Amino acid sequence: MTGVRTIGVIGAGQMGNGIAHVCALAGFEVLLNDVAPERLQAGIKTIQRNLDRQVHRQMISQDARDAAARRIRAAASLEDFADVDVAIEAATEKENVKRAIFDELCPKLRKDAIVATNTSSISITRLGAATDRPERFIGLHFMNPVPLM
């Protein structure tokens, strides 16, 4: 891998949509996925509202808002993550749920892709050891609310 260009985020709830938001503002292409299509659409709408709020408060320009919005795409399936450079899991704080996500996700990723968890309480070492790439597994914790922190 020569650099990070595309980031996949699993979980479109409060943390996941916030992570997708800041990644897009930072210039990365973002794929956002959720197990529930309605939550995925709600997450995209939340990002749009939060970007609009940032423009209204003069935190970002309209051009920056529009560029960030264009960088975010809904991913209906983890199959869409085949070319991401980094996959960030931001699902519920339950180890069995996170492990199930990694079991499904890792075989779909490139071998050089980095896998990250947003966990705040589960052992990152234990989660990484259960994947096919413990040496490319990291903890990447964001504080809430992500777009403001």
List each model region and its residues.
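Hydrophobic/aromatic beta-strand patches that form the interior of the parallel beta-sheet core
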Residues: L31, R73, I88, I138-L140
